[in-house]
Regions:
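NAD(P)H dinucleotide-binding glycine-rich loop of Rossmann-like/cofactor-binding domains
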Residues: 100-131
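A structure-centric signal for secondary-structure junctions around beta-strands
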Residues: 11-12, 50, 100
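Basic/polar N-terminal segments that are highly enriched at the extreme N-terminus
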Residues: 1-12
Length: 131
């Protein structure tokens, strides 16, 4: 895949997990334009929590390569066509535990168990980030 953004994509640097138990590698990656319900954020800061460390050390198997870190703060760069709650330039923090808000798990306060179809990427979808 090309590392050239197509005008709507963004080229940025990221700490990439290539192999568990090895140091992260700083690489340039292409971040795809946001889908209809997605927001692209220019990350200003990102924490690594203990679950990230489990991915890095291999305790939680995960498809690789991967970019750890899900506790980020930054500025909205672009929004998808259906996004109505934030706009480019807004300061935001992330919650990457996607949930639908209306299934039995969400309404009972167990959003981490949500299986709402609209929170999952379809099988065979193009990658959102490429190296």
């Amino acid at each position: 895949m090309s590392l050239e953004p197509n005008g709507e994509d963004t080229l940025t640097k990221a700490a990439v997990l290539i192999e568990p138990g090895k140091p992260l590698v700083i690489e340039e990656v292409v971040v795809d334009k946001p889908g209809p319900h997605e927001v692209r954020i220019r990350t200003a800061a990102c924490g690594l929590c203990h679950s990230d460390l489990h991915f890095i050390d291999g305790a939680y198997p995960h498809p690789l390569p991967a970019i750890p870190g899900h506790e980020a703060a930054g500025i909205v760069e672009a929004v998808g066509s259906e996004v109505r709650t934030v706009k480019p330039g807004d300061a935001v923090v992330t919650c990457l535990s996607a949930f639908c808000g209306h299934c039995e798990f969400c309404v009972s306060g167990r959003m981490s168990l949500c299986m709402g179809g609209d929170t999952r990427r379809p099988a065979g979808s193009a990658p959102r980030i490429t190296r």
